[in-house]
Amino acid sequence: MTDGRQQHTRRAPTTDIYDATELTRAFEQLMRTKRFNSLQEQSRSRSRTQSPSHAQPYHTPPHPSRAPPPPPTGAHYPSSQSPSQQHQQHQLPASSSLRNLPVFPSPPRDQQSLKFRNLLHVLSVTPTKYENPGLLDEALSLIPLDRLYSEAEEESQIMQAQAASVGGKPEWGYQDCVIRALLRWFKNSFFQFVNNPPCSRCLMPTIAQGMTPPTPDETARGATRVELYRCSESTCGSYERFPRYSDVWQLLQSRRGRVGEWANCFSMFCRALGGRVRWVWNSEDYVWTEVYSEHQRRWVHVDACEGAWDQPRLYTEGWGRKLSYCIAFSIDGATDVTRRYVRSPVKHGAPRNRVPEEVLVWIIHEIRKKRRESMSKTDQRRLMKEDEREEKELRAYMASALAAEINNLIPREQTSGRPGEQKTPASMQDTPVDWVAAQQMGPGQSGPDRSQDGR
């Protein structure tokens, strides 16, 4: 028996009994089966209580998606469902928020869902403004192209040499290096972060006085709101206005602002250099940029305000923020990219209660259809394959996080080695602070949490 226990101990590191991948697959299959059975039970309950004369037709998703057809869109059935069924139906959106389970697109009907739909449609217009040829020409005239291309060429050659020495592939391509050079120049030389603007008369610090209506000239320049500040010097007492411009033309002139202005202007610069750009909106009042890497065939997180490149876990694991919705908008449509930035919904996810998940999927498909309806069939198929590839990537993040959680629940046995020697749990080996420190490289250093400053 002793030999058997010792032999089992030696095999523990390589045993397949607690294979995290298999546990993840089994858990996901269990949840899919549970949801499918629940939907079948709801369907049978409705068919028994609903008269055929009152049945309503099916609604087909507006986007020619690969999703299954949606369920019947009838009214609510409070009298035909037991309290337990109603509670189960209420809990379904929460269990499907990971988006690894089937979600049937459903159009918004209640006032709150319609309001959120209108908000996303308004936000989706932002990246379309970057397609103005005159704006792009003006941006190119301000960018030191020779300097950026030289830096990108040098960095690209270094990466190629490093990859050749180990027989691998360079981490980033030349176009990625161009955007990285742009990021460094934009943060260090072009744009200025403003908290309280200094007094224009005596250059002393100012004190916030609240909001004030924009002047006609400020409105014409795209200012949606204006902050008012008073000079802290008693002998001066002058007031300073800080218009919050959303027009990129004006940002090229002012070259200052907070996170919102930084992300808006930098995204346009990326577009001017020929990059595919996303403007990412976060419901916790923060924004950033994503650029598409043809080299890695994926979207890359870029935060110009922080000088951060490909650090999607910065906000949650780095700053300890809780995020609910992260929606990326581009000229090709919209995508819910929350799973890229919230790897552990339990630890870092805020409640997603603005709309049901199936309504959010419907809105995303609606925006995509609107942006792509004038495209050629070839481009539509290309984007659809790209959507599928990204969906696979986002699901992998959730599967990995789930596997890690399951793995942490498994009791750790002492492995063969020195008596009393124990390995450090995986959850303690890489803390958020260590991870952020390791990611502070390349374009710049990640600074303090600016999300409290607002957009």
From Swiss-Prot:
Domain of life: Eukaryota
Biased composition (Low complexity): 38-53, 74-98
Binding of Zn(2+), residues: 199, 202, 231, 236
Gene Ontology annotations of biological process type: glycoprotein catabolic process
InterPro entries registered for this protein in UniProt: Papain-like_cys_pep_sf, PNGase, Transglutaminase-like
Gene Ontology terms: cellular component: cytosol; nucleus
Disordered: region residues: 1-110, 408-455
Disulfide bond entries: none
GO terms, molecular function: metal ion binding; peptide-N4-(N-acetyl-beta-glucosaminyl)asparagine amidase activity
Family the UniProt entry places it in: Belongs to the transglutaminase-like superfamily. PNGase family.
Protein's name according to its UniProt entry: Protein png1
Species the sequence originates in: Aspergillus fumigatus (strain ATCC MYA-4609 / CBS 101355 / FGSC A1100 / Af293)
Lineage, broadest ranks: Eukaryota, Fungi, Dikarya, Ascomycota, Pezizomycotina
